[in-house]
């Protein structure tokens, strides 16, 4: 496996990182710890060495800590995140960080990110509570090793955050062949890399959407749908690690196989342009930029928001309104009909989707 330089940190990593947000769960919606142990450790044994989790991923940090026990913690770079939007005072920062260290069964987190920064979160939390100085203190104390941020907002906001601090060592952005001009996009990738930051990629398959593309799109790809989507990213020298939120053994084994042959410049010019053209065609067809992160899962009405958006986007791709209506009705009591427009989901959405407005339109169409 061809390892890549991680910015100016002195670290190097396999091209594939294990994202711990979408872990396999059992019939009671509990993380399958035995599966996590076996799958993550096997990946590490085969060269993977970057593991990404977060405070707000339900059960993830605890599961990660257990899986990395028995000597595996020392074999990886461990990344986790500070949920800045949960801060009410500076003391909260230390309480959360110490809780994360306990969950992860470690005395330090290698790569520590401010989670899901936007202009609003920067101004109302990072600046208000001087979180950068807290991050620097945590680094000086040895509780974290490298300071970074993950991001969900406009390119202008990304540039503002980059410019605001000279000590950034890495960042994490959403990027795939569908999102080349969305949020930070390719321009943000190139800018961050030009400043010496390592760049970690999330949502390489757009929450799984790019793994199951229409036949017309699949036929355009130089290789399989998943492999082509990952290769599009690994082809770029600016990218240090591509995260994949793997939830099945098959996904993990397949992605490790793809990563074993990943290299910078692996695509021909024709292959690059073909994949970009496929993205253009898909982007023209769909209207809701949902990645199925399920941060909206806090809905007090238990509406299946991400599933509803997936149904609508799939309808736009394949034109099958009959199937879309049937899939929507199959949600039973979890359709958009129950929405009371409380706005809790909108506050949590990293894609800044006006969720209840979209739900209302979809219900009128499919309900």
Where do the model's predicted regions map?
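Glycine/proline-rich, positively charged
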Residues: 27-28, 41, 45, 87-202, ...
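Short hydrophobic/aromatic-enriched beta-strand-loop microsegments
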Residues: 74-78, 167-174, 263-270
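A short, structured active-site edge motif that brings together acidic residues
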Residues: 74-86, 112-115
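N-terminal binding-site loop/beta-alpha segment at the start of enzyme catalytic domains
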Residues: 1-76, 134, 140
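Conserved residues at the C-terminal ends of beta-strands
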Residues: 19, 54, 112-115, 150, ...
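Conserved, mostly hydrophobic/aromatic
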Residues: 6, 18, 43, 51, ...
